[in-house]
A protein has these predicted regions:
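Non-cytosolic membrane-interface motifs at loop->transmembrane helix junctions
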Residues: 106-118, 140-142, 170-179, 228-232
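C-terminal transmembrane helix-loop-helix hairpin of multi-pass membrane proteins
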Residues: 173-232
């Protein structure tokens, strides 16, 4: 019954309107200034994202290897490893929620991106819930060639070259992707996309929506910064 309610809710427009509304209802926090709204909010977000993952840089090679091994295991063993993989994805998102979105900086003290913590925690909990209800079937069947268009993008975001056209293989072990939502999400979504209709649809919908929302936002911010530099 609960699963049916969630399934119906994630098909309604108002559910996603609530997720978007959290942008305004859950402002970022700084220990130096309190809760922040308006233009300052963007500054705090940028500052936190700049510094949040730096303490974990030494662990990135190990984290990359762990992610690769988990993906390889679910591709090889399917449902025999599916429950463990789903739990791993859920826990990964919970770690991302708090590690990527909190940082201590000289300018703002403790900075917290509140809305991201709420969004990413929701995603993590939805996938952890799937460990119990088992809505995802990791039986990988042969797909039409065109459906594999997601794979190159998944590899690219996991690789995450540090600079344009700098495809140094070392980034496959040193990038921030295991703890960065916008980098690891395309990797996970590519797997679930190939399982479409055999996957937990509420979890997939929410993950895809928030990922798309942040992706469009990041592209827009990057474009505006490029325009600003061109005219200064």
């Amino acid at each position: 019954m609960e699963s049916e309610r969630l399934e119906r809710a994630t098909r309604k427009w108002w559910f996603y309107l609530i997720l978007v509304a959290l942008l305004f209802l859950a402002p970022s926090y700084s220990s130096a200034t309190g809760f922040i709204t308006g233009e300052k909010n963007g500054e705090v977000v940028a500052e936190v994202l700049t510094y949040s993952l730096k303490p974990y840089k030494p662990f990135m090679p190990l984290l990359h290897i762990i992610v690769i091994l988990f993906i390889a295991a679910v591709l090889v063993y399917g449902n025999r490893f599916g429950k463990i993989f789903t739990a791993f994805v859920g826990v990964n998102y919970l770690f991302i929620a708090f590690l990527q979105n909190t940082a201590v900086t000289e300018r703002y003290g403790l900075g917290i991106i509140t809305v991201n913590i709420i969004w990413f925690s929701l995603i993590g909990l939805l996938w952890l819930r799937d460990v119990k209800i088992r809505k995802t079937n990791y039986t990988f069947s042969r797909q039409p060639v065109w459906r594999y268009w997601v794979v190159p993008f998944a590899v690219l975001t996991f690789w995450s070259p540090d600079k344009p056209w700098d495809f140094n293989p070392i980034y496959l072990l040193t990038s921030d992707s295991p703890l960065a939502f916008c980098l690891i999400t395309p990797t996970y979504l590519s797997i679930f996309y190939l399982l479409y209709l055999k996957v937990n649809l509420p979890a997939l919908r929410v993950t895809s929506f928030i990922g798309t929302l942040l992706g469009i936002s990041n592209i827009g911010i990057g474009f505006m910064r490029g325009v600003a530099r061109a005219y200064t």
